[in-house]
Every structure is written in structure tokens, then in C-alpha cells.
Regions:
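Glycine-rich, basic loop-to-helix element that forms the pyrophosphate-binding segment
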Residues: 1-9, 30, 87
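Short aromatic/hydrophobic "clamp" motif used to bind/position activated sugar donors
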Residues: 14
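The conserved acidic donor/metal-binding loop of glycosyltransferases
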Residues: 18-22
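Conserved donor NDP-sugar-binding/catalytic core segment of glycosyltransferases
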Residues: 25-58, 133
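Short, flexible, basic/aromatic active-site loop/helix in glycosyltransferases
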Residues: 44-48, 60-83, 89, 162
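Catalytic donor/gating beta->alpha subdomain of glycosyltransferases that bind UDP-sugars
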Residues: 50, 98, 104-167
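A recurrent flexible, glycine/aromatic-enriched loop bordering the glycosyltransferase active site
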Residues: 70-95, 108, 114, 134, ...
Length: 168
């Protein structure tokens, strides 16, 4: 997993990406520019999209974009360059992970919430840049969405066992 990869990193920066996601052509370049400007953690807006653009997927996308679907994270809603509480698909200086330690391997999901909490405890900030955009495919069928949201809720509960403040 991530901890194995982090042990092998030889460069200055680490970019975390996940499944069901694609990026603007300048995604990596724009992340690197912000790191070169002195930021430790940087990312951009994550925009939910459909795969086939049919009416069923459009309806599920409306649900996904609500506060009940993807939540209230600033990286889904903000457009301006500012510090936010967390990021998806961020680029980190390698030294950040050296400072805060490895991912909690007991967490199969929501491990980034716990990791970001520890980063904030160490004083790191999360810069949202309007020049950085990622796109995440929303689930294309209702059963898939229900399964995903159930899993998210389950893992939030498990994560709270390890870190009660990482969702506040």
C-alpha cells in the first residue's frame, strides 16, 4: 500500500491519486509549481462527473454533489486560492510524511482523514489552487452508490475509533 510506496520515494514530492479519477493535462505541472513556490501540501478542486451522461447518471450526480453525497469539503466547492481543511488527490513534500509518520494500516478507507489530521496537528496547511483540477466519476448506478456510501459511513465509524477529531 501507501506505506510501502512512501518508503521507496526518492524524489521531493509525492502525488496521491485514487481510482475513478482523471485530471487536467497540466495537473502535475500545476501541483509542482505550487510545491516549488514553497507549499508543503497542495491540490485543487475535485469535480464529480458522469461516465455516460445519461439521465440516470445525471440524477445520481445531483445526489452526489449534495452535502449528503460528497459532504461539505471545501475542495469540492471552492474556486479561489486559499488554505482549506483537507484535499483530495494532493501533492505533498516527502518531508511531510517523514515528519508525521506512516498511514494507519488498520484503516482500509478514510485513512487520508486520519493522516490529514496528524498533518494539521504538526502545523501543515492544505493549499487549494484554482489552477489544479481533478475529476471523479460518480457512481453510475444506484446500487453502486448505496454500497459506496454505506462503506464510507462504516469506515468513518472505524476511523473515529482511532482518531475522534479527524472529522471535526
Amino acid at each position: 500500500g501507501w506505506n510501502v510506496a512512501l518508503k521507496e520515494v526518492t524524489g521531493e514530492a509525492v502525488l496521491r491519486v485514487d481510482a475513478h479519477t482523471f485530471f487536467d493535462k497540466d495537473f502535475i505541472l500545476n501541483n509542482v509549481k505550487e510545491i516549488e513556490n514553497g507549499e508543503n501540501i497542495v491540490g485543487g478542486k475535485c469535480i464529480s462527473v458522469t461516465q455516460n451522461n445519461n439521465w440516470k447518471e445525471k440524477l445520481l450526480l445531483i445526489a452526489e454533489e449534495s452535502i449528503f453525497g460528497c459532504g461539505i469539503a471545501d475542495f469540492r466547492r471552492k474556486e479561489s486560492k486559499e488554505y482549506v481543511s483537507t484535499l483530495a488527490f494532493a501533492m505533498y513534500r516527502k518531508k511531510v510524511f517523514d515528519d508525521v509518520g506512516p498511514y494507519n494500516e488498520n484503516l482500509a478507507r478514510t485513512e487520508d482523514n486520519e493522516m490529514h489530521y496528524r498533518m494539521k496537528q504538526k502545523g501543515y496547511k492544505f493549499l487549494l489552487s484554482p489552477n489544479i483540477k481533478s475529476y471523479r466519476y460518480a457512481r453510475s448506478d444506484l446500487n453502486g452508490m448505496i454500497k459506496q456510501k454505506y462503506g464510507n459511513g462504516k469506515w468513518i465509524g472505524i476511523t473515529l475509533h482511532y482518531c475522534q477529531k479527524c472529522f471535526s
